Amino acid sequence: MNKTNQLINICILVTLFLIGSSSALTLQVEPKSQECFYNFIESGKTSLLLYQVIRGGLLDINVKLTDPKGNTIFERLHFDTQMKGKQSFTAGESGAYKVCFNNEMSRFTAKVVTFTWASEEEGVKEVAKGDSITPMDQSVQKIERVLQSVIHEQKKLRYREQANRDTSESTNARVVWWTIAEVIVLVVMGVGQIWYLRKWFDNKSTGRV
């Protein structure tokens, strides 16, 4: 019974880690600009940054993460079609960590980025009682990693679906406007032909008189 209660408590803590300490944000990074966000992380805590470019150009963005002193933890030019946007790290000191999404390399195209920045909650590392981690704790940690991956993939699919829907709606709108333009051109041409024929017959009638 104790093991069952321990497993329940661990699962609750894992759930809090997954859904209580992170929030998904979606933003548009305009051309020749960057957007930065801060997250206060305590020393020794593990943090996970998940990000994805869902619309714009080649689905590329420059990502840079810095510590409270401004030192670069990692920086890369991310292509969403070539790699997963995922970076985990352990905070070396307490303070405000900063992530920046830079689109300065693009002159005309804005990029739509969605990201989740999750930080480890108090107690997650202290789940196991005693000095050693039990097989049950190891299983729960494995489940935690799997759940994180599943949640990330679900969000990726959802945002990709939204991007495809936006593209489809935009295409449909262009088709509608193109059809309207064609109708207007046909009407103008028809009116012009009728006017020309009437004028031609009027000239013929005048010539006979």
Swiss-Prot record:
Pfam families: EMP24_GP25L. It comes from the Eukaryota. Residues 25-174 are lumenal. It is found in: Cytoplasmic vesicle membrane. SMART domains: EMP24_GP25L. It is a single-pass type I membrane protein. One of its GO terms (biological process) is Golgi organization. Keywords: Cytoplasmic vesicle, Membrane, Protein transport, Signal, Transmembrane, Transmembrane helix, Transport. Residues 34-119 form the GOLD domain. Residues 1-24 form the signal peptide. Residues 196-209 are cytoplasmic. The keyword Ligase does not apply. Its main location: membrane. Belongs to the EMP24/GP25L family. Could have a role in the budding of coatomer-coated and other species of coated vesicles. This is Transmembrane emp24 domain-containing protein B. It comes from Dictyostelium discoideum (Social amoeba).
